Amino acid sequence: MSKILIIEDEEPIRRVLVRILSDEDSGFEIQEASDGKKGIDLIKKESFDLVLCDIKMPKIDGIELLQRTRKTNTSLPFIMLTGHGNIETAVESMKLGAYDFISKPPDLNRLINSVRNALEKKELVTENKILRQKVA
């Protein structure tokens, strides 16, 4: 079961994301944080397979959260969400290693596909690393 952290300050959006991704057939375990500070604290304490993160949040915004996380964890996939979708923010988040950038309100099929693809890529990278160690 993949463990996903949703960091979103807007409660109605967070509730929708949790409901969609915690569908009984999804195979996802969901945790949530209402701001960037709570999100970074959870990332430090627990292991996640994916982070779904809003960009504009109080205390610590999504870009800063991504930057801080990348200092200690370069492999944790991030999907960035924003209601203020501009190209500069998308480019900045992708340069920092975000897997995807999705405008709010998200197209649900696109969101689910992006989550599944990010998790699949993470799994393949992990398998590749293990195989390389066996060969070496």
Task: Give the residues covered by each predicted segment.
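Short amphipathic alpha-helix used as the core "switch/output" element in two-component signaling
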Residues: D41, I63-S75, E92
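Helix N-cap/capping motif at the beta->alpha junctions
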Residues: E32-D41, G62
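Flexible nucleotide-interacting loop at or near the entrance of a catalytic core
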Residues: R110-A136
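Receiver (REC) domain active-site loop signature in two-component systems and cognate sites
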Residues: M57
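Two-component/phosphorelay signaling modules centered on CheY-like receiver
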Residues: E11-Q31
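Active-site residues of response regulator receiver
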Residues: D54, T82
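Active-site beta3 strand of CheY-like receiver
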Residues: E46-L52
